[in-house]
């Protein structure tokens, strides 16, 4: 039971990390804004992969 909670939280946070930049991209729709959000998402993914080990 204890493993299920953190796993759900991680999935939720991952979804937020993926959805937030895409929503901001839809709102701004400028090529200059697309790059920073993708870089930020990439940094977050590396942080998540490091923390999981």
Swiss-Prot record:
Induction: Accumulates upon infection by generalist herbivores such as Spodoptera littoralis. GO terms for biological process: response to insect; response to wounding. Keywords: Apoplast, Cell membrane, Cleavage on pair of basic residues, Membrane, Secreted, Signal. Transmembrane segments: none annotated. One of its GO terms (molecular function) is LRR domain binding. GO terms for cellular component: apoplast; plasma membrane. It is found in: Cell membrane; Secreted, Extracellular space, Apoplast. A motif (SxS motif essential for MIK2 binding) lies at residues 49-51. The keyword Membrane applies. Coiled coil: none annotated. Residues 1-26 form the signal peptide. Its main location: membrane. The keyword Cell membrane applies. A motif (SCOOP motif) lies at residues 37-53. Belongs to the serine rich endogenous peptide (SCOOP) phytocytokine family. Interacts with MIK2 (via extracellular leucine-rich repeat domain); this interaction triggers the formation of complex between MIK2 and the BAK1/SERK3 and SERK4 coreceptors, and subsequent BAK1 activation by phosphorylation. Brassicaceae-specific phytocytokine (plant endogenous peptide released into the apoplast) perceived by MIK2 in a BAK1/SERK3 and SERK4 coreceptors-dependent manner, that modulates various physiological and antimicrobial processes including growth prevention and reactive oxygen species (ROS) response regulation. This is Serine rich endogenous peptide 3. The gene is PROSCOOP3.
């Amino acid at each position: 039971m204890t493993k299920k909670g953190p796993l759900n939280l991680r999935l939720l946070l991952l979804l937020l990390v993926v959805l937030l930049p895409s929503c901001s991209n839809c709102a701004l729709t400028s090529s200059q804004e697309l790059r920073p959000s993708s870089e930020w998402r990439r940094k977050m993914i590396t942080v998540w992969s490091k923390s999981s080990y």
